[in-house]
Regions:
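Carboxylate-rich, polar loop motifs that coordinate divalent cations or form catalytic acidic clusters
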Residues: 1-164
């Protein structure tokens, strides 16, 4: 299947997820984000130039929260959100040199209670307070002093977060 830019999904796929409207989102590492609308049977290419290549260096994770806000990791040291299906990307942190995820490989994004986003990375688990734009490290080292690789996170309740 070809997209609106006459490109198919040809590169490493990082994630496939759905949204509240029944659409399917495919995040590729270096090509684009694709949206498949099952009602219209159309594949739409987002975040790429007219040649079908990604406008950014590399994409990581994408997550739709309960309000259908899209959260995206572009692997440039920042997190982004979009309330209009990736038409507009808003950085969580201002472009003032504060790049708390610079050099990180983000494995999982999970919005949580108290206006926080939980971020699993290859060096641990971090909590981003979206109100005051602060980052708190929750897990970083194991008993032997090695980095903790957090690939998956899930809430059991508002007060209990599981990481693996």
């Amino acid at each position: 299947m070809k997209s609106d830019l006459d490109t198919g999904i040809d590169y490493t796929v990082n994630l496939v997820t759905g949204d509240k409207d029944g659409g399917i989102w495919v995040v590729t590492q270096s090509q684009a984000v694709f949206y498949y609308n099952p009602q219209t049977n159309k594949l739409i290419n987002y975040l790429s130039d007219q040649s079908g290549r990604l406008k950014f260096g590399s994409l990581g994770q994408l997550y739709f929260d309960s309000d259908n806000v899209c959260w995206l990791d572009i692997r440039d040291g920042n997190l982004y959100f979009s309330k209009d299906k990736l038409q507009t990307l808003v950085p969580v942190f201002p472009k003032d040199g504060n790049e708390p995820f610079k050099g990180e490989y983000i494995c999982k994004l999970l919005p949580g209670p108290y206006n926080c986003m939980y971020v699993g990375t290859i060096t641990g688990l971090k909590e981003v307070n979206l109100t005051n734009k602060t980052v708190r490290t929750l897990l970083s080292k194991d008993e032997s002093g090695d980095d903790i690789y957090v690939r998956e996170i899930a809430f059991y309740s508002d007060d209990e977060l599981w990481a693996g």
